[in-house]
Amino acid sequence: VKVRATTHISVTPETGCTNGCSPLSGQPGGSGGVDDVFARQHDPGIGAEIMGAGKFGHPGWHEDPNWQGAWGPNPPFHTPVFVLTHHHRPSIEMEGGTTFHFIDASPTEALETAREAADDQDVRIGGGPTIIRDFLAAGLVDYMHTVVVPILLGRGVRLWDGLEGLEQDYKVEATSSPTGVTHVTFTRTGT
């Protein structure tokens, strides 16, 4: 069972900042070719997902008892999803097999809970960037896919802060796409 941080977070080249949106919005899965290959690798073999409260909802979502996420009645996960939050809430069962569970846990504790629910499949760390950084810093990620987008934002959450030397533990490969993005994969060495 592997831990995958298969993100679709846009990372800018100037600072490694993220804006939380897909670089290929309007083109789900990209326009074909290499983007499509990476998009097709996103879901197979995933048995559970971990995400941060910021990915689950807008600031203050925890104050709205009717908020069920931004994905509508049939979210795209189709697995148990563990939302890391300090705001306890009962689990929410959605169409298509997605159940949101709200937990206040360390990365190690959250991963243990997600692995139990994953039924011997991989666990995906879905984001946001702070959650991904926490799992990377704890040495819990086996594989990560990040998309570098050729835009300058000048704002956003910095993904790489505090992760100096990360490349020593991973085989890093970059694949450029005709769409202008670069897919960067990190595969843990020695696993």
What are these regions (language model features)?
Residues 1-191:
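Enzymes that bind and transform nitrogen-containing heteroaromatic metabolites
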